[in-house]
Structures are given as C-alpha cells and as structure tokens.
UniProtKB/Swiss-Prot annotation:
Coiled coil: none
Protein's recorded name: Arylamine N-acetyltransferase
Transmembrane domains' residue ranges: none
Quaternary organization: Homodimer.
Localization of this protein: Cytoplasm
Gene for this chain: nhoA
Top class in the EC scheme: transferase
Residue numbers carrying N6-acetyllysine: K214, K281
Activity modulation notes: Inhibited by salicylic acid, acetylsalicylic acid, 2,6-dichrolo-4-nitrophenol, N-ethylmaleimide and iodoacetamide.
C-alpha cells in the first residue's frame, strides 16, 4: 500500500478492504465527509492554498485540517486513483445563490467511470455536498445518506440540484470537458482572492455525521442538524470557545507546525468581521 493510502486510511479510520467497486466508493465518500471537515480558514488567516500533489495531503491528512473543494476533491481524486479507480476532476459554476450572470468555474468535482457507468463524486461542497456518489443520469432522483439529489442535462451542461424541503435547488452546473492543473490553480486563486468571494467574508465549517446529520459553523454560530432540521443552535461566547469547538466537534488539528494555528491567530481572523459573538449568524 502506498504512503498516501496508509495516511489517508488512518485519517478516516478505515480498516476494511478497498476493492475497486461502487461499495468502496460509497463507503470512502461518506467516511471522508464525516471525518475531514470543510473549512475556509486559510483564506482568512490568510495563507496561500497550494494545489501541488503534496500540499493538500499534508494539510488535510497529515495535519488533520480541513479545506475547500480544490483541496478536498484533490485529495479524494488522488486516493481513488491510487486504489485503481478511473477518475478525473471537472470544474463547475456555482449557482446556489441564483447569480444574475453566469459565474466562473470555481468548483472542483469528480467524474468516476466504474462498471460501465459514470458517477459524480463530490466531497467538497460544504454543508450541501454529496455524501455518496450519484449516477450521471438526467432527471433521476437519487438518495444519499444526507438527502435527495438529481442531475438535469441542459445541452452539454449538467446541473446538480438538491431537494430542500420539497423544493429543488440548483447547486452548480458543469460539463464533462477535461481540465488542466492550471484551471484548478486559476479557480482556487479566484475563490481565495476575489474581494466578493464569500470565502473571504465568513468563517465556514461543516462536518457530516454518519446518522444523516451535520454540524456547521458560520462565524460564531454553531448548528447541529438532524434530517435537515436544526436541533441545536448556539452563539459561541468568545474565541476560546470557538477554538475549542473546532477541535472537539469538527476534529480540526491545530498543532501542526505548518498548518496549525493558535487561538490568538484565530482571534485576529474573527476581529476582522463585522460581527461579534453575541450576534454571530
């Protein structure tokens, strides 16, 4: 077994077999989502997010941090390829907030070809991300551990939607064109540095739970969801509490010499927002 697989399996607490089949893909997808949190802290610190072969693995796997789509799906793609899966990355345009104009390609997702079928896998779309692969088939409702999704085909494009309280909400649109490393670097740079990028204006964190729930942080506001409904919400009183919740609830590593961060560094990040613990939303 290669070093990255050893490290990755230890990170997600995987001890089973890893055959190249749909059962393995489903199990790894869910394990990843439930162990490695989505988070954008490096954008805010700020630290440059590197996408070379080693950097995402060092950060998300070795240092036990989280990351966003370019890192999350970059690591997952490499793991799947090491296992023998036929996988490649795609780039999508995020339309979740109904933008007035077509946005740039800033979301990385995965296309897996397996057993004469094509599947979409995505461990990096935050709180609404897939937690299981879905078939690349149009207008088919597909159930995952955390909700229902469907794909719609519009010409050469595909649109991923999720069922939000009986209303279908579009998340992003993509095509199947092959992308280059420079395309991911460009999308990553734009996401981290464009002044209006939402990653620059809020602390965002999410970890899914095996029972179908999820935990989220938006600035100082912590929420625990079950079956799509909030069962616990609280505003954390101070940065020390936020720092503790990141470690205890999201499993975030903070001690790594390169990728860790101190409570004082976190305090500087949170002071930059036009919000305070009592009103964190």
């Amino acid at each position: 077994m290669t070093p990255i697989l050893n490290h990755y399996f230890a990170r997600i607490n995987w001890s089973g077999a890893a055959a190249v089949n749909i059962d393995t893909l489903r199990a790894l997808h869910l394990k990843h989502n439930c162990t490695i949190p989505f988070e954008n802290l490096d954008v805010l610190l700020p630290r440059e997010i590197q996408l070379d072969n080693q950097s995402p693995e060092e950060k998300l796997v070795i240092a036990r941090r989280g990351g966003y789509c370019f890192e999350q799906n970059g690591v997952f793609e490499r793991v799947l390829r090491e296992l023998g899966f036929n996988v490649r990355s795609l780039l999508g345009r995020v339309v979740l907030s109904n933008p007035p104009a077509l946005p740039p390609r800033t979301h990385r997702l995965l296309l897996v070809e397996l057993e004469e079928e094509k599947w979409i896998a995505d461990v990096g779309f935050g709180g609404q991300t897939l937690t299981a692969p879905i078939r690349l088939v149009s207008d088919l409702v597909q159930t995952t551990p955390h909700g229902e999704y469907r794909l719609l085909q519009e010409g050469d494009d595909w649109v991923l939607q999720f069922n939000h309280h009986q209303h279908w909400q579009s998340m992003y649109r993509f095509d199947l064109c092959e992308q280059q490393q420079s395309d991911y670097v460009m999308g990553n740079f734009w996401s981290a540095h464009w002044p209006q990028s939402h990653f620059r204006h809020h602390l965002l964190m999410c970890r899914h739970l095996p029972d179908g729930g999820k935990l989220t942080l938006t600035n100082f506001h912590f929420t625990h969801y079950e079956n799509g409904h909030a069962v616990e919400q609280r505003n954390l009183p101070d940065v020390a509490s936020l720092y503790a919740v990141m470690q205890e609830q999201f499993g975030l590593g903070v001690d790594d010499a390169k990728h860790g961060f101190t409570v004082d560094e976190l305090a500087l990040v949170m002071a930059a927002f036009d919000t305070h613990p009592e009103a964190g939303k």
